[in-house]
């Protein structure tokens, strides 16, 4: 990806695991600088999913412009590609108004796709697949994995020797493109992301404190009506467990409880555990990112630290 030049408009990315305080910090930033908030959250795109997605309340939305929330109903789907298109459109509008987009959220895939685009892989080829299947019958999939290791060691390292489906697909891409699948995946739809990005990451200095926050947060959601929220969505939209909205952390566990698959106590336990696992994945994404300005989300005077950092970047005229 070619980097935008210094004349490109600025954008601030505020990223972090769930329960790290992103939303509160976004409000503080918006009260100090001419920004508009763009949600980067795969649950907040859904209407009626307010409590479990921790949407800002109506008064905050009136005070501070928020974008990309309440886009679709819970029985609909929303892709990373759609997010990229919508986000770029919204960001262009914010910039045209002389303001700075402040992108806030924890859906790390959305952040990545927004900046890097989506890689395009060739469609399946029946003839190549038949040839690969024949070779596998003769040699076995572990031997095919060895072939893949020579052609694309990066991808082979991620695939188990008996994972026939993924081995076949990786080899198929190699044969169809003449390039390793790992190289193809780096080729993005867009050469340039037309913004200078300032990446701010909230990283907990003490993971156990973040875990305690997650437990308290989930309990608060239950206290203020998460079960009733999911019940209304289930009854009004006839959603099922395999729909994207009900695969969101918290919603899945409450849905299982409403379907009498688990008890109330188990729902709470599973909800907290799933949220902690989500936070772990989010932190893994963040630690793999480049050009990241990290702040301890548990630090005292965190808002002042981040506001001071933004001021030093001379983002605003």
Swiss-Prot record:
Kindly list the residue ranges recorded as spanning the membrane: none
Q: What does this protein do?
A: Catalyzes the transfer of a dimethylallyl group onto the adenine at position 37 in tRNAs that read codons beginning with uridine, leading to the formation of N6-(dimethylallyl)adenosine (i(6)A).
Q: Provide any one GO MF term from the record.
A: tRNA dimethylallyltransferase activity
Name of protein: tRNA dimethylallyltransferase
Q: Which UniProt keywords apply?
A: ATP-binding, Magnesium, Nucleotide-binding, Transferase, tRNA processing
Report the cofactors: Mg(2+)
Q: Name one GO biological process term.
A: tRNA modification
